[in-house]
Amino acid sequence: LWMPKLLGRKIVVTVHGLDWQRAKWGNFASFVIKFGEKMAAKYADEVIVLSENVRQYFADTYQRQVTYIPNGISRPVPKEANLITEKYGLVKDGYFLFLARIVPEKGLHYLIEAFRQIETDKKLVIAGGSSQAMEYMEKIHRMAAEDTRIIMTDFVQGQMLEELYSNAYTFVLPSDVEGMALTLLEAMSYGNCCL
């Protein structure tokens, strides 16, 4: 940040969220990330944020006006349940969908605990891969194995992903910390009810 500034270059910083709040960072890493945020607020020529909450945070915390540019998504064409029926036995409106990286701050453990307490014929589909949190991933696999209604697909893309979004009863993302989740926007673009 300082080197380009010393050379007279313009600096534009995009802030996706308040990463220092994430549980995965220890105290030192959180301090470093927070320090970087302060430097960006003070020295960047322009700061771009992806959510109104982060815009308000910068105004309140640093008295800094920032530019709000939300994530953009394409408007999809919904797909019928074909691959997901063949591979997982899923039907339209027959499942709740969680789609995200499987890391603690996404709150999947809360969702599984809550789902196991409700009586429903609907399934819970967990789609996503781990991101350096193998211990957590193993915990999630153990929790999911205790309920036959829970289906773990691992990472999905292409037609499988489109079918999962298109046919979900409800999309659920119980994150502890979130900037502007692209998966939430995608789920909304398919017309899903979102929690």
What are these regions (language model features)?
Residues 53, 72:
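Carbohydrate-associated surface elements
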Residues 176:
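Aromatic "clamp/platform" in nucleotide-sugar-dependent glycosyltransferases that forms part
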Residues 137-156:
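Nucleotide-activated donor-binding/catalytic signature segment of Leloir-type glycosyltransferases, i.e.
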Residues 6, 30-46:
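Membrane-proximal helix-turn-helix segments that form the acceptor-binding/catalytic region
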Residues 155-156, 163-168:
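Short alpha-helical donor nucleotide-sugar binding micro-motif in glycosyltransferases
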Residues 78-90:
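A short helix/loop element that forms part of the nucleotide-sugar donor recognition site in Leloir-type
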Residues 94, 98, 103-117, 135:
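A conserved mid-protein helix/loop that constitutes part of the nucleotide-sugar donor-binding site
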Residues 171-172, 194-195:
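A short hydrophobic beta-strand element within the catalytic core of glycosyltransferases
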